[in-house]
Every structure is written in C-alpha cells, then in structure tokens.
Amino acid sequence: MAFPHLQQPSFLLASLKADSINKPFAQRCQDLVKVIEDFPAKELHAVFPWLVESIFGSLDGVLVGWNLRCLQGRVNPVEYSTAMEFLDPSGPMMKLVYKLQAEDYNFDFPVSCLPGPVKASIQENVLPDSPLYHNKVQFPPTGGLGLNLALNPFEYYMFYFALSLISQKPMSMTLHVRTSDCAYFTLVDRYLSWFLPTEGSVPPPLCSSPGGSSPSPAPRTPAMPFASYGLHTSLLKRHISHQTSVNADPASHEIWRSETLLQVFVEMWLHHYSLEMYQKMQSPHAKLEVLHYRLTVSSALHSPAQPSLQALHAYQESFTPTEEHVLVVRLLLKHLHAFANSLKPDQASPSAHSHATSPLEEFKRAAVPRFVQQKLYVFLQHCFGHWPLDATFRAVLEMWLSYLQPWRYAPEKQAQGSDPQPRCVSEKWAPFIQENLLMYTKLFVSFLNRALRTDLVSPKNALMVFRVAKVFAQPNLAEMIQKGEQLFLEPELIIPHRQHRLFTVTTSFLSPWPPVVTDASFKVKSHVYSLEGQDCKYTPMFGPEIRTLVLRLAQLITQAKQTAKSISDQYVESPTGRSFLSWLTFGLTDTNSCYPANDLDEIGQDSIRKTDEYLEKALEYLRQIFRLSEAQLAQLTLALGSARDENGKQQLPDCIVGEEGLILTPLGRYQIINGLRRFEIEYQGDLELQPIRSYEITSLVRALFRLSSAINRRFAGQMAALCSRNDFLGSFCRYHLTEPALSNRHLLSPVGRRQVTNPARGPRLSLRFLGSYRTLLLLLMAFFVASLFCIGPLSCSLLLVLGYVLYAIAMTLLTERGKLHQL
C-alpha cells in the first residue's frame, strides 16, 4: 500500500502542471489555495520548488513566471489582485512556507545562481562573510562543481523572490511600466512592513489549518545571538554560534524571519562587485579566520583550495544594475531607516542598551550598520563609477540621498511637514554621520567628478546638482561632516598598533583611552578602515583639493546659466517666431551658423526657466556649504564674461592659455563634441568656392559658377569702371557687384584679435543664389500666383525684375557705401 502513497506527490505535481497550461490564472490560484489547505506537508514538499519557480521564473531568466515586475493593477486588475492576495505575507503562499517549515524540510539552491563574489568565494572553499550561508553549503564529494545551499522553505522562497529582480531580463523599453505601480515593488513594500515593523512586533507564523501542524517557532538554522553583533563580528564566533541551539531563548525566535529577509535582500541586491574589492574590505583579523577556515575545509575535502586568481577569473561578468533595481533598493533603505528610528528614546539611549532588551530592539540597532552599510557603500561606488552620464542617474542619486537623511524617516519628522524652512539637523544624528562618513564625503567627491562631465544646461542634470547641494546645505549638516573628518584625521598617539585591532572592539581596548573624543575618533576610523582598508588615502571633503573642484563646478554652473540665457534669447529670435515675409527674402543661410545648441531648443522656455532656477539655487547652496565668498563667485563670473564674444551670447569651450594660444581641456573637448560650446570660426576664403550645401542643387550651382566666371572675365573692366563712379549708378553697381570686404574680417582668436590682410578682388557677378532650392521654389510660387490672376510667364518675369530693381534702388539709397550682401 506504500507504492500509491509514494506516487501521490508526483501525481499532484503533474496535475498542477497540467492545470497551469489549461486553466486561467484566477482559477489556478484558487486551486492552489485548496491544495495548500487540504494536502499535508509531506505531499506538498515536491510541489513547492516547482510552484516557486512558476511564480518568480527560472534563475537563468528563461521562464518569466507570473512576471510580477510588469503586472500592474490599473492594466490587469483581476490578475494583480489575485497575485497580491496569494503572495501576501498572510496569504496562502506563506502558509505553505510555514507548513513546510514546521516539518524541517530543506531544498537545494544552486550556488551558481548566487551573486558573483559569493559564488566565486564559495567555489574557492571560502565561507562568505555573512551568517546567511553558514552551515548551508553542501560540498560534493568530488569538490568544485555542483555546489548547493541547503535552505529551509522560508529562505528558499526569499532567495527566489529577491533574485527574480536581477535574474529576469530587463523590461522592454516599449513597455511603459512605473516601478512603484508593479506587483513586485508592492510585494517588497508589504514584506518589509510585515517582517520589519515600525510599530509592534513581528506577527507570528500563521497556521495553515486548524487540523494541521503548527509551524515551529525556530528556523532550521537558528539566528545568531545579537550579543555577538558588531561592526565586524568574528567569522569563527559566528560559525560557532550557528552550531549551538537557541531553544533556551524563545524570545530570539521572534526575529529570525526578519533577520533572514534582510540578509537575503542585501546579499542578492547589493552584493555585486569584484571579488578583489570584497577581499579588500575584510579586516586582517577576519582574513586570518577565513584562511583558517579555508585550510580546514580543504583538509576535510582532501583537496587543495583553489587559488584566488582562479576565483577572480571565474568572476568576470560585469554587473550593471537597472533603474528598477535601484528603485527597489531605495525602498529598502527608506524602510530600514524607519525601522531603525522606530526605537523609543529610552530604548535608543546607551544606558538602555546595557539593560536587557528584546531581540527586535537589538535588531533595530544592528540592522543598518551590521548588514547594510558595507555592501551599500561599495554598491554605490560601483553605480557612481559605471552609470551612464545621463538623466537616469537620478534614481541612483535619490537612493544615495535617502540613505544620507535618516532624520526624514524619524517619527518627529511628521511634526515638521508644515514648516517650509529647512530644519536644522539635530546633534543626535552626529553618531550616524560619523559612522557613515565615507557615504557623505567620498561619494560627494564622486558626484562632483560626474557633475563636472555633464551638460548642466539640461534641466534634468541641473536638477540633480540642485538636489545634492540642497541636501548637503541643510543647517548643521556640513559642520557635523567636518567634525567627523576632524575625528578621523586626529593623530593616533596612544596605541601604536591600534590599527591592527580596529575590528575587535571590546571594552578592554577602549578603557585606557580618553572617554569621549577618542572613542568617537575610534569609531570613525573603524568605519573608514573597514570600508577602504587601512592603507587608504583619505581626501578631506573640506580640504583644498575638493574646494578646487567645487569652484570648478561653480564655474560650470555660471557657464551653464549664461548658455541657458543665450538659448532663451535664440529661442525668442528663432525662425519659428519670424514672419512669413521675412522667410521669403532672397539670400543664403548664414554660412557660419553655430552647432545645434541643446535639447532646450525643443523643450521650450519653461524648462529654460527651471534650469536657471535650479542652477541659481545650487550655486547658493554650494556657497553655504563650503563658505565661498561673494568675491570668489563674482570673480568667476567676471572671468567668464571676458571669454564671450561681442554679442554677449556665445561662450567658448573650456580651455587654458598656452604660449601659442588657447589649449582645449578634456572638458572643452567634451563640450565641442556634444555641441555645447564652439569657437567662433568664420569662412575667410572666396565665398564662391564654398562647399555646395545640402539646400543647393549641385549641377545647377556648378553651371551658374561657370556662367558667372565667364561673365566676370569678359566684362571685368566695364564692371570695375562702373563701380568706381561716385554717382548713384556707381553705388547701385557696388551694391550688387562688390563682394564682402575681406579687410573688415578678423581672425577670431579669443587671445588676441587681428585683422586679415587679403589681396583685394575686383567687382564680380554672383549667380549662386539661383541654385538654391528655396529660390527656385519661390519663383515657382510667384509664377503660380501670377497665373491665378491671368498673368503670363513673361509678364510675371518682368514684374519680378521691376520689383527687385525698386527694392535694390531703395537699399542703395539707404546705404552709404557698398554693404555686405550675400546672394
């Protein structure tokens, strides 16, 4: 009788797979709810991996599953509500997870699908620096290949859920999906609110049915005691702590799901950078333990550990986060700040920390510094260094700024909403700023370097500079950052080898030092060394080097403001605002027209006004942050004004003055390539020999050139005699037969202008204007209009000639001498 019972799970799985193809989505979910309620865990065990994969898609991205990243309530309301009810933290799927959790089932998760650094580290037989992987790695007898993690149902579900964000292919650009409206984003928010509550405690696991077995309050692998939490908890201690049982402390079971969820999200979403960087961040003490553990594992497997170069070779794929990925990480950071700030004042005080507190309260204190800070810093560095120089960087920027402002998510923030003035950053946030110093200073410098390479005339780029400047200009924030830098730069005079013990913080180490300042200095140094290594070279944010960069940015802001004003003037004077009659005038298009300026020409005056407003406020904020004087900013404006041409509109590319003139800087080359700036260069040669334009008929221009050249050679003497007369006929001939006076042109060198000495040419006739498409079109239109009034071609031609002669006589009378007239 055992045979049919053993075949039952396979039959159930086959039935569900068939239903997934034949039944509609809502009906399938209803059937799954009944299956979860009616069948015991032993029969659901085989269904669970298939169900998870069918929901979140395969780890290789081939199967999309329910496609939660594109599922929106306003587009597919029925499917959206059904999926959200099924996957809710209190929904049927989590009941299935808890039912399997109670029976202590494990599921294999392939190591090859983990983030690159973790995968390479495990394949090198090195335990990653995260409690999430302890006691879970299953090394095969042959070693090397086919590694798996033995995960409990909750871990397995969360691994798939988190990895589906990055394993699935990016959404098509043709799909207009707002990330905040999609089902995946909403589920992340619900899971964070459920397992990281800002009020009350974590809800207990739900029993799947009254007759079923209730889930165990403890996971298969117990969470480590929070007494061992620190900036860098010992790997060996963590390894030992995971060997022990926590059944003696039932209160610690309250937060194991919260801890697991946070670790999974951080590891899957933030742990993406080179293995070399990962190893660089390890403290010397941790590296010794890693080496000891690697030797132990290698000895147990009877095979030598792979060298680190092979691990680095195995991790060669470059990881580029998507905008959707960054937005989800920002949601995580905002919720973590609210979660950590939900501690009551008496619980958050150091004195309360020394007394007995609940595991959830300890977790609130340790969540950000213990799990998030290090990986987020390197993740942000990667984004700042590799993200394209376009407006999509706004997502990364807002994620960074959200982390820098935990006070925005504090409970007292609600009472500040009605005050339009920026509130002073309280001194109680000084420890957070000091322990996250590099997040403020080094990443600010990285942003400066990006801003110096972007087109600040674009309103989106101007907005990003404004946002950063506004955040750092909050009252008292710059002072606290500067105080943190002073603490880090404080010389170490007491313990010469203190840097080797920065990552084993104990009371015995701190006791011989002065109580307040040295302790704060020690924490800042610990933070910097843990993220950058002990051989890092720190550049102060308020030092002379960064101040030079800020002045450079201020100069670019001033340039951008002037360019925006110039574009605004050109917008008013653009051809779209000219009259129809002015378009009908004969003549060539300006041969020295400038490059296409900026997308502002197409956006309009409103965006130009916003750009000027953003840049003006950003400049003021930078002046407040770095205490720039009005004289310095005025000097920048004066220096820029001297580099502009006579009409006060066009600006030169960025350059320096050398011995032989101006030399382009890298920024200047960037400005020329992108059409942001140009040198004012005019054609100085024979106007008749200019290249044929796209608006001209090539064969006709060449024929007219040969005809006019023959006429000029044949009648050169007569034309010269006519133009030399001092009467009206002479002025009339000079108006038509004299070319532009080359003696009035200049070599437009910004360093020094000098006149050009060119040999004078005699009067000559130019018929090139007749080779223009526009001229021929106007003539055809004139003949067509004349035909409507029953005027023949010959009569129309005579009228056109007569009209032009009258126009030329009027222009001759108004002209004192021959003027520049390009035909």
Curated annotation (Swiss-Prot):
Q: Where in the cell is it found?
A: Endoplasmic reticulum membrane; Golgi apparatus membrane; Nucleus envelope; Cell membrane, Sarcolemma
Q: What does this protein do?
A: Catalyzes the hydrolysis of membrane sphingomyelin to form phosphorylcholine and ceramide. It has a relevant role in the homeostasis of membrane sphingolipids, thereby influencing membrane integrity, and endoplasmic reticulum organization and function. May sensitize cells to DNA damage-induced apoptosis. In skeletal muscle, mediates TNF-stimulated oxidant production.
The gene designation is Smpd4
> Activity regulation here?
Activated by phosphatidylserine and tumor necrosis factor (TNF). Inhibited by scyphostatin.
Bilayer disposition of the protein: Single-pass membrane protein
Phosphoserine PTM positions: 130, 245, 749
What is this protein identified as?
A: Sphingomyelin phosphodiesterase 4
Q: Does the keyword Coiled coil apply?
A: no
Q: Keywords of this protein's UniProt record, alphabetized? A: Cell membrane, Endoplasmic reticulum, Golgi apparatus, Hydrolase, Lipid metabolism, Magnesium, Membrane, Metal-binding, Nucleus, Phosphoprotein, Transmembrane, Transmembrane helix
Q: What is its main location?
A: endoplasmic reticulum
Q: One Pfam family, short name please?
A: mit_SMPDase
Give the GO cellular component terms, alphabetically. Answer: endoplasmic reticulum; endoplasmic reticulum membrane; Golgi apparatus; Golgi membrane; nuclear envelope; sarcolemma; trans-Golgi network
User: Which PANTHER family does this UniProt record tie to the protein?
Assistant: SPHINGOMYELIN PHOSPHODIESTERASE 4
In alphabetical order, the GO MF annotations are: metal ion binding; sphingomyelin phosphodiesterase activity; sphingomyelin phosphodiesterase D activity
Gene Ontology BP annotations: cellular response to tumor necrosis factor; ceramide biosynthetic process; in utero embryonic development; sphingomyelin catabolic process
User: Per the UniProt record, which EC number(s) apply here?
Assistant: 3.1.4.12
Residues annotated as carrying Phosphothreonine in the record are 665
Which cofactors are required for activity? Answer: Mg(2+)
Transmembrane regions: 776-796
